[in-house]
């Protein structure tokens, strides 16, 4: 009975006992299939924290950089900041409370940049908001962030006896009507179809993340580090290899909210509390191109800066339930840009 109680987290070895008999001994193992979701989370965060500390230790001496603000208000303001430590949010704090509350992304030398991502050199900076004439980059960041939050919710929504494998969050435009996350659930759940109560439960968990006001941390790592962090996820390993192959340095971007870590190109929004109306609205089965059934979870959200009347929200919610495909999304985006 003791052996059964130890279940799949132990390996049974036989040893020759004194006198020629055989005795059994159980030793703990650390193979992928034998780690619980809690243990996986702890392992990933340990590796993330170690890499973050290692990168910080590479610049023990504080170096100063000059950051010039080129926005419409207060143009030409120059901040003297700390290299690899100060972030766009640090600069916003020197401007005003308005910039801290309204800024969703920064443009650093023209490149979209997370608000909490450290600045690496002297540069020009501009802050982006939802109310800009062209909020395209902000909208993309918001959709990515909402998808990552949904991934966090789905990974933790099922009991430990069911394996949940996050595949990826497809990059779909806001105009598609819903953000998405592709997931492979335990084969024991192949016949499961979510009820309205299930969707409400997912939504409730998402609002718990919003209420916690968690920051989106960002960390750029070598592919080998990302592969170690996600060594137990076949789909993430494949995704990491794909992303690493797209740049000669084989750098992969990771993001974290709370203790949930994911692979995301970014940039993402600063904090979960920027979301206001948020709902996990649908789950669709994708065409079976792989041995395992892939589910596409979908949701819709509006930020606190763009709240909608409930009648408009209901229309957005209804639209978000229609299955989003990447081909349709690309076609829609091309039509709107011409």
UniProtKB/Swiss-Prot annotation:
According to the entry, every stretch annotated as the TGS domain falls at 63-129
- Identify residues that carry N6-acetyllysine: 126
* Compartments where located: Mitochondrion
Keyword set for this entry? Answer: Acetylation, Leigh syndrome, Mitochondrion, Primary mitochondrial disease, Ribonucleoprotein, Ribosomal protein
Instruction: Please give the tissue specificity annotation from the record for this chain.
Output: Isoform 1 is ubiquitously expressed. Isoform 2 is heart-specific.
Under the GO molecular function aspect, what terms does this record hold? Answer: nucleotide binding; RNA binding
| Associated clinical condition | Combined oxidative phosphorylation deficiency 59: An autosomal recessive mitochondrial disease presenting with multisystem manifestations of variable severity. The disease spectrum ranges from lethal infantile Leigh syndrome to a milder disorder characterized by hypertrophic cardiomyopathy, lactic acidosis, attention deficit-hyperactivity disorder, and survival into adulthood.
Q: Which family does it belong to?
A: Belongs to the mitochondrion-specific ribosomal protein mL39 family.
**Quaternary structure note:** Component of the mitochondrial large ribosomal subunit (mt-LSU). Mature mammalian 55S mitochondrial ribosomes consist of a small (28S) and a large (39S) subunit. The 28S small subunit contains a 12S ribosomal RNA (12S mt-rRNA) and 30 different proteins. The 39S large subunit contains a 16S rRNA (16S mt-rRNA), a copy of mitochondrial valine transfer RNA (mt-tRNA(Val)), which plays an integral structural role, and 52 different proteins.
Query: What is the official name of this protein in its record?
Result: Large ribosomal subunit protein mL39
